[in-house]
Amino acid sequence: MGRSLKKGPFVADHLLKKIEKLNDNNRKEVIKTWSRASTILPLMVGHTIAVHNGRQHVPVFVNEQMVGHKLGEFAPTRTYRGHGKSDKKAGR
């Protein structure tokens, strides 16, 4: 179930201020954030946002197709290394 339209999308205040400041100065630089729950807004398009995945900051370049999604969707938190491989030597 989505968020109520009367509430509007959630975006962390500090992140919104940083992006508006960069847009006013027409600058593009990487913005570090821990706010994975923030919704991507149209004013974020074209910026690179480094989203924390619990271990490091993953750079995410925002494009038009990402608008409406959350930042955390583009920074995976788990590394899948595949299921256990069958060891032929152990079977002997």
UniProtKB/Swiss-Prot annotation:
This is Small ribosomal subunit protein uS19. SUPFAM superfamilies: Ribosomal protein S19. It comes from the Bacteria. Pfam families: Ribosomal_S19. Belongs to the universal ribosomal protein uS19 family. Protein S19 forms a complex with S13 that binds strongly to the 16S ribosomal RNA. The gene is rpsS. NCBIfam families: rpsS_bact. GO terms for cellular component: cytoplasm; small ribosomal subunit. Gene3D superfamilies: 30s Ribosomal Protein S19, Chain A. It comes from Nostoc punctiforme (strain ATCC 29133 / PCC 73102). GO terms for biological process: ribosomal small subunit assembly; translation. HAMAP family: Ribosomal_uS19. GO terms for molecular function: rRNA binding; structural constituent of ribosome. InterPro entries: Ribosomal_uS19, Ribosomal_uS19_bac-type, Ribosomal_uS19_CS, Ribosomal_uS19_SF. Keywords: Ribonucleoprotein, Ribosomal protein, RNA-binding, rRNA-binding. The keyword Cell inner membrane does not apply.
